[in-house]
Amino acid sequence: MSMGLEIAGTSLAVLGWLSTIVCCALPMWRVTAFIGSSIITAQITWEGLWMNCVVQSTGQMQCKVYDSLLALPQDLQAARALIVVSILLAAFGLLVALVGAQCTNCVQDDTAKAKITIVAGVLFLLAALLTLVPVSWSANTIIRDFYNPLVPDAQKREMGAGLYVGWAAAALQLLGGALLCCSCPPRDKKYAPTKIVYSAPRSAGPGTSTAYDRKDYV
């Protein structure tokens, strides 16, 4: 695997990891839907994983942290846990990628480096899935409630910027992890057998005495 491809994969995965952190902190997973009687509402409600915010028409914003985890919908409760695990898993994957990077000397063997890089890629892929699942689940819940006639218009929400950031983060981590998984261990070098050249013994000259004289055989 070339160093350029490895750097590209690691960079994309790091961007996805940072985007996941932004997605986790952004209080804009759900936004007030302006339909029906809510069109004349002079405030906008944002709902995130950790707090909800109310933005007045004057531009004043007030945010409040959730008092209890049970106050959250089921999809946001699961999203909290999965997104946090995704961030921690991607952070561990980044450390593994640095250990197996070609520009570091933590590991000397090229084959071991390639295997470590593949492990880092798998960790980033798992982190991407842990981000993609809660984001898609929350988006599905929002769309389902939006078109449900039994849900009052005041309780209907639209998809916020946090969901789009989450999808972008998952895509970056998937692409970066896939590039890191392309790191193949180097093949064993095959050496050609050494040819041994035998030289013929020199024949003794006519006047040269040999180790054994002919008279010894008589």
From Swiss-Prot:
The chain crosses the membrane at residues 9-29, 81-101, 116-136, 160-180. It is found in: Cell junction, Tight junction; Cell membrane. It comes from Canis lupus familiaris. It is a multi-pass membrane protein. GO terms for biological process: actin cytoskeleton organization; bicellular tight junction assembly; calcium-independent cell-cell adhesion via plasma membrane cell-adhesion molecules; cell adhesion; cell-cell junction maintenance; epithelial cell morphogenesis; establishment of endothelial blood-brain barrier; negative regulation of cell migration. It comes from the Eukaryota. InterPro entries: Claudin, Claudin3, Claudin_CS, PMP22/EMP/MP20/Claudin. This is Claudin-3.
